[in-house]
Curated annotation (Swiss-Prot):
Gene3D superfamilies, per the entry: Lipid/polyisoprenoid-binding, YceI-like
Database matches in InterPro entries: Lipid/polyisoprenoid-bd_YceI, TTHA0802/YceI-like_sf, UPF0312/YceI
Record-given protein name: UPF0312 protein plu2095
Keyword terms: Periplasm, Signal
Length: 192
């Protein structure tokens, strides 16, 4: 009886370890520019203003069969902000908005990943402008597989919202400009 119990426990431990082994680590493909982190916000309620961050780095762990093992970590250099207008970008880097002299980086670290149907709900801590708050991103696996260079890739699209007042933005552009939409598209190369 003791032998059967020990064998059962050993087999169970091996199965648990095997499912954890399916989780793969990916580096976001920044060198190949197969990644985008941006935002949009209403400008005075009349139009959408789009911006992007050109300098960021990160990684993720992905296991389609065990979403609880999935993790995301991203660091953004806020001064790399680009809205296609140099004067506006300078103003957005100021104390009224991102305050890049005092807070040069933003960081997102996931705390939980859940699969809901074909999509993923990624909850994490966003540190921006000296404040850390939970943020929810809705993500979708765009695809995964071997690439022509001998690697293996996985790509995701994600979106979410943040309230500007939650992150100490000082300027107020009216009631329709209180939230920003986050727009993310990343492709990761599996680490060997």
């Amino acid at each position: 009886m003791l032998k059967k119990t020990l064998l059962g426990l050993t087999a169970g431990a091996l199965l648990l370890n095997a499912s954890s082994a399916l989780a793969a680590n990916y580096k976001i493909d920044i060198p190949g520019q197969h990644a985008f982190i941006g935002f949009r916000i209403q400008h005075l309620g009349y139009s959408w203003l789009y911006g992007t961050f050109k300098d960021f780095d990160g990684s993720f762990t992905f296991d389609e069969q065990n979403p609880a093992e999935n993790k995301v970590n991203v660091t953004i250099k806020i001064a790399s902000l680009d809205t296609n207008h140099a004067e506006r970008d300078k103003h957005l880097r100021s104390k009224d908005y991102f305050n890049t002299e005092k807070y040069p980086e933003a960081k997102f670290t996931s705390t939980e990943v859940k699969k809901e149907g074909e999509k993923y709900v990624v909850t994490g801590d966003l540190t921006l402008n000296g404040v850390t708050k939970p943020v929810i991103l809705n993500a979708e696996l765009m695809g995964e597989g071997k690439d022509p260079w001998g690697g293996y890739r996985a790509g995701f699209e994600a979106s979410g919202k943040i309230k500007l007042k939650d992150f100490n933005f000082k300027a107020d552009l009216g009631p329709k400009s209180q939230e920003a939409d986050l727009l993310i598209s990343i492709e990761g190369v599996r680490e060997k």
